[in-house]
């Protein structure tokens, strides 16, 4: 086999090699059925077992209480930008959005179709280099909800702690750091996440929603856009992304077999430190975008001091087997996405490349 790439893609992103190899082994004949999991009816007993195993394991790994539902939807986090306000924001209500990057801006924009979104806080004036201080977040007790984006892939920032919103439901887009660290689910009314960074391949959107919110959701909206439709049918109202759910379940098994979410967090801290140390010890040759207290463990964003040298850095890195180091097209620069499945060895190899490149060109 060709040597595996050092995959730092921002999403879809690296998957555990052992999960890929297991899927390869099971691809043609799944559980002695004579069929691939991709060929099976989503109403079959075998897929039903796969589906329910994945839900149960996510609940176990994240200690999700009984008063929450886990849904497997489609449309990505981008559809959740619409579904959240469509279900919970009426024309005479406000919802508070914390703006910490491009994705929170997109969510904010979608909410305008349904009610009145207001800025609870924003760090746009600081080029989204940091997460707003908890004390700066403003919202009213009668807000429909408060919305945050827990990790910002483009700018490389991440929430360490979450706001206490009291009786106002806290909604979080956790697409890029779900399952990267333990969290207290009960702080949140709703969590949503596209799978393609930490949970599996693209095509599945995970929603964790408190049951009392389901009871309050708008009933006068299209059937497929109601959370209750999917909660009442165990996410099987229509044909689900069967292979994606199977892969998600296998990734969850991998997390469990490698020590669970607490162990994942420790590995992520170590991986990120390896690269951040290379930036911090470079005497300004590499410059991080995010302020240190807001640095993401998932997306490490930086610039090379000289623009022409930065282009050379990215070209040589690509030639050396590093994939996905270009920053987002909207901001440029460099970005190393170190999601759960990215091995420490890849981060150490990137560190060594960065140090070597600096020594050659400083």
From Swiss-Prot:
InterPro entries from the UniProt entry: Aminotrans_V_dom, Aminotrans_V_PyrdxlP_BS, Pser_aminoTfrase, PyrdxlP-dep_Trfase, PyrdxlP-dep_Trfase_major, PyrdxlP-dep_Trfase_small
Required cofactor(s): pyridoxal 5'-phosphate
GO biological process: L-serine biosynthetic process
Reactions the enzyme catalyzes: O-phospho-L-serine + 2-oxoglutarate = 3-phosphooxypyruvate + L-glutamate; 4-(phosphooxy)-L-threonine + 2-oxoglutarate = (R)-3-hydroxy-2-oxo-4-phosphooxybutanoate + L-glutamate
Matching Pfam families: Aminotran_5
Annotated residues for binding of pyridoxal 5'-phosphate: 77-78, 103, 153, 173, 196, 238-239
Sorted UniProt keywords: Amino-acid biosynthesis, Aminotransferase, Cytoplasm, Pyridoxal phosphate, Serine biosynthesis, Transferase
Transmembrane segments: none
Cell compartment(s), UniProt: Cytoplasm
PROSITE patterns named among the record's database cross-references: AA_TRANSFER_CLASS_5
Pathway: Amino-acid biosynthesis; L-serine biosynthesis; L-serine from 3-phospho-D-glycerate: step 2/3
EC number: 2.6.1.52
Cofactor binding annotation: Binds 1 pyridoxal phosphate per subunit.
Entry binding sites for L-glutamate: 43
Catalytic class of the enzyme: transferase
One GO cellular component term: cytoplasm
UniProt modified residues of type N6-(pyridoxal phosphate)lysine: 197
Signal peptide: none
GO function terms (MF aspect): O-phospho-L-serine:2-oxoglutarate aminotransferase activity; pyridoxal phosphate binding
Family per record: Belongs to the class-V pyridoxal-phosphate-dependent aminotransferase family. SerC subfamily.
Reported function: Catalyzes the reversible conversion of 3-phosphohydroxypyruvate to phosphoserine and of 3-hydroxy-2-oxo-4-phosphonooxybutanoate to phosphohydroxythreonine.
Subunit architecture: Homodimer.
Protein name: Phosphoserine aminotransferase
Source species of the chain: Lysinibacillus sphaericus (strain C3-41)
């Amino acid at each position: 086999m060709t040597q595996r790439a050092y995959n730092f893609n921002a999403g879809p992103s690296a998957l555990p090699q052992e999960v890929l190899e297991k899927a390869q082994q099971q691809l043609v004949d799944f559980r002695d059925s004579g069929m691939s999991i991709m060929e099976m009816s989503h109403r079959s007993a075998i897929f039903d077992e796969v589906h329910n195993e994945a839900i149960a394991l996510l609940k176990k790994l994240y200690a999700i209480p009984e008063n929450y539902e886990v849904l497997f939807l489609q449309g990505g986090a981008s559809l959740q930008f619409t579904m959240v306000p469509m279900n919970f924001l009426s024309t005479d209500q406000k919802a508070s959005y914390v703006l910490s990057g491009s994705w929170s801006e997109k969510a904010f924009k979608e909410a305008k179709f349904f009610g009145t979104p207001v800025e609870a806080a924003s760090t746009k004036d600081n080029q989204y280099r940091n997460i707003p201080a908890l004390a700066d977040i403003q919202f009213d007790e009668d807000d429909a909800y408060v919305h945050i984006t827990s990790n910002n892939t483009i700018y490389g920032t991440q929430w360490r702690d979450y706001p206490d919103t009291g009786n106002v439901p806290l909604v979080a887009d956790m697409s890029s750091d779900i399952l990267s660290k333990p969290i207290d689910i009960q702080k949140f009314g709703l969590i949503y996440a596209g799978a393609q960074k930490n949970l599996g391949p693209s095509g599945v959107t995970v929603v964790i929603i408190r049951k009392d919110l389901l009871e309050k959701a708008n009933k006068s909206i299209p059937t497929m856009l109601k959370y209750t439709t999917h909660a009442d049918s165990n996410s099987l109202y229509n044909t689900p992304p069967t292979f994606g759910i199977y892969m998600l379940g296998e990734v969850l098994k991998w997390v469990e077999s490698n020590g669970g979410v607490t162990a994942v967090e420790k590995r992520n801290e170590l991986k990120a430190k390896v690269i951040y140390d290379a930036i911090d010890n470079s005497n300004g040759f590499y410059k991080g975008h995010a302020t240190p207290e807001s640095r993401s463990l998932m997306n490490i964003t930086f610039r090379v001091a000289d623009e022409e040298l930065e282009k050379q850095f990215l070209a040589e890195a690509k030639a050396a087997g590093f994939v996905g180091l270009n920053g987002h097209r909207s901001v440029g620069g460099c970005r190393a996405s170190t999601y759960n499945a990215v091995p420490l060895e890849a981060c150490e190899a990137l560190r060594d490349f960065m140090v070597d490149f600096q020594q050659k060109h400083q």
